[in-house]
Amino acid sequence: GSAELRMRILEATAERFDREKINCEICCSSDGIFALLCPERKILIADGEAGIKSDRGIDLNSLYGGLYPRELMRIYTCEKKKKTDRCSRFLQAAESLKSELVRLDSQSIDYAKIVAFTLRLWKKNGGAMKGNIGRETKRFVSCITPDGVELNMKAFDSCDRISVVVDRTGAVSARIVDRIRRYALGSGYDVTSFVCSLDGKTVEHIIIPELRFGVFSSEHYHRLLPKKERKIFASRFHTQESEKVKNRLSFTAKAYRSLMNEAFESMIGAREEEEKINYLFRGISDTKEAVDEIAVQLCD
């Protein structure tokens, strides 16, 4: 079905929950609302295309079947799936090359320099030991979109001091970020960790809210730097061995960017097909039937 229609239905459902005094959290992506979460009732209402499995569901294509041309819908949906699958394959290949970049670049890192530097950095910007372990909260601050990698720079507005590690591969910056993160948690300070949107696990940036201090990793797709920054260049933590893999790094980095660009092109194509699908459903303004169906299923 149409993403626009699904979002309108979720918005209408959230308004109904609000009228009925049901606690509801609205979950959004870069494109808009994709889910509603009711923690107290243990209910999740989500876009079926998000990959969440459930024995309950509402098929908008059936619910509004007589209001749009089915054959056009089938064609647009198939084209969108082809381009989405193509994008996924390129992103997976790009992730593999990114891992190879980190592996190659890690061969010439002087780890003793990183340990000494991060210790000095923490002593300068950290706080006193609290005698307990801090709590870590993981968030995404960047996302991969048809327009490229979007980065929410407002996340760093609360910081008075930011150390920016300029690193072409992320091999050095990830280690610096991780060590400062460990120092902070071990000293009892809560940490907000921002995870890489490509692999979903590597911590790229951190903020220590209580200290108003953050560490930011700047690479090819994170060129916009936060204000109040102090730049740290990754090259100072490498030995002369880096010259041996210089050409391989350059070639792999070029291939990585090429794969990412192909992924962006596929996402643009998928977005165009999505717009065609949205156009088919644009004349449907009444979402009451779908909202009522959601309410009935939740009451079963």
Kindly label every feature range from the protein language model.
Residues 1-14, 149-150, 154, 158-184:
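Glycine-rich phosphate-binding P-loop
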Residues 14-81, 183-261:
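Conserved nucleotide-sensing/catalytic segment adjacent to the nucleotide-binding pocket
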Residues 32-34, 48, 121-135, 250, ...:
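Rhodanese-like catalytic fold shared by cysteine-dependent sulfurtransferases
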Residues 72-126, 248-297:
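An accessory alpha-helical subdomain
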Residues 112-154:
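N-terminal pre-Walker A segment at the start of P-loop NTPase domains
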